[in-house]
């Protein structure tokens, strides 16, 4: 039986299965912050988890969800990202979800968005609105240099606006869906960590102020 694990960043962690109870969790205790600071708040009418760097420009990081091991299946999230006050000119509001996070939490797969690229007049930047990376061996710089355009794509985005994303992972393949679209905006057929498993984390890049209002995981 497929079971959906819903991690509501503020208040609860709920395993959705026949008769399964809700397990209340405090937001700060539901995640381990690694290179980020997290706090419960309200944003644009929703209870949310705010994720920022301890100091703007330090390089981003992750908030690792407790008690989750994920191999294949579906990950859904509602998120909103924008450049943080005082961020450098190159900040794009980088925000996403890391998956298959390894015991060394610097090793993971990730899909993320660049919200300020979504409606810019620069077509090349628009083409870079979404991104796949596999840290630490395959950051965006290496992927763009070695295979330009393969691990990035366009999608309409607005900074600071709630955006629904869905990541479907199957073995060494993954698909990113945005705005409940029936077709993926980015397809990866060669996940760099291979067919493995690991944790799930909220992800932000350098100079980002991020908000997450839900996280739902459905194992395959």
What annotation goes with each model-predicted range?
Residues 1-4:
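Positively charged n-region of N-terminal signal peptides that target proteins for export
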Residues 19-220:
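Extracellular glycan-recognition regions
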Residues 7-15:
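Bacterial N-terminal signal peptides
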